[in-house]
Amino acid sequence: MDSHRGRTHRIPVLLAVILALTSAACSDDGQQTSSGDTRTAASPSLRPDQQIPELAVEVLVDDLTNPWDLAQAADGTVVFDQRDGGLSAYLPDGTVRDIEADFGDLYANSETGLMGLVLDPGFADNRRFFTCQGYAGGEGDIRVISWEMADDYAAATRLTDPLVAGLPLTSGRHGGCRLRFDTDGALRIGTGDAAAGSNPQDLTSLGGKTLRVDPDTGQPWPDNPFVEDAGANPLIYTYGHRNVQGLALRPGTEEMYSAEHGPDVDDEVNLLIAGANFGWNPVGADPGDYNESVPMTDPNIDDAQPAIWSSGEPAIATSGATFLDGPEWGGYDGLLLVGLLAGQGILALQLDEDGALLSASRLPGFDGTYGRIRTVQLGNDGLLYVTTSNNGGDVLLRVTPQL
């Protein structure tokens, strides 16, 4: 991999007012909401009375292969991983450093490998961080592991291995696995259903769920919704998911949002509510069947929670998610961004204060420019960091707003 600090592409403001999201799910001038009506989005601006920034896109690192997740430390270092194994650090001086770490037990196949990564909120002092990976030992599963990072980012050693185990693994399809912290300090884990039909609705399975765990012990967070239910795994926070790819905490709130893949239709963004069932139920006629023709939110489930946004047809493969936050983003401040794999761009959602969808559009300058977008993440410096997922020739990008 190579560092390319200083290669910058500026995206004109003019593009911001013409790139509305269009898809087969809605008419050419509208966007489907969760209730099925359409609302035109002429611009991804949350605050139209404020200036729309130009976006300066800089390639920080290239020659990567499927970088999956990233996190920025308080010192400005960006830590990132690659799905087939390996951790790296982009240092503030532009140096890229490989982090020595043991991934000898990594299972990497299909959609599963080394996936989610998040720094502990106290990373500056405790140097702790967390990853999620396929595990090749025993019968195989997906596991969350805690690590300690060396002060110079040269090496990382395992602390709690595993912190959480038993996330289902089959062929490598639908492995999840995104990690983020909430405002209480709990570790949230978004999982995939492992393409097994019974998993999403089975409260004894960790597949097709979001989990909420104590990052010190891996035990359930004390007020999890199923801690008193003997028939459920107490780690579970929500269920009825297909393949959670993104988690995003809305600044200034306790609201956590997920982005997940639909089959060939209906990718979703959801506002996570404790104990809620999000309605994915792909059971077939025979045991072991995986029926992907069913709707993402099954109307036969009375309490199924509707998505706040759905792609309709075709699916565009929603992935990592983050909120823009800060005056430097001008009219973009407050937008929920979602990376698009098949859609090859960045979705920009405008939400009201209750989390309801107001409009959907595309962030300018990314449609097909960099291929498949895996992760979008706001850094501690207020800038946007992006990874691509093109099975080679991938990049780590930094996006700077310019008012």
Task: List the predicted regions and their residue ranges.
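Beta-propeller domain segments
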Residues: 37-50, 81, 112-114, 122-124, ...
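C-terminal motif of bacterial Sec signal peptides marking the signal peptidase cleavage site
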Residues: 21-25
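Blade-loop segments of beta-propeller domains
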Residues: 96-121
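Asp-box/WD-like beta-propeller blade repeats and closely related beta-sheet repeat scaffolds
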Residues: 141-180
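Bacterial signal peptide processing site
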Residues: 27-29
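Beta-strand-rich domains and repeat architectures in extracellular enzymes and scaffolds
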Residues: 59-85, 316-323
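Surface loop/turn motifs at the tips and blade-to-blade linkers of beta-strand repeat domains
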Residues: 59-65, 100-109, 163-170, 228, ...
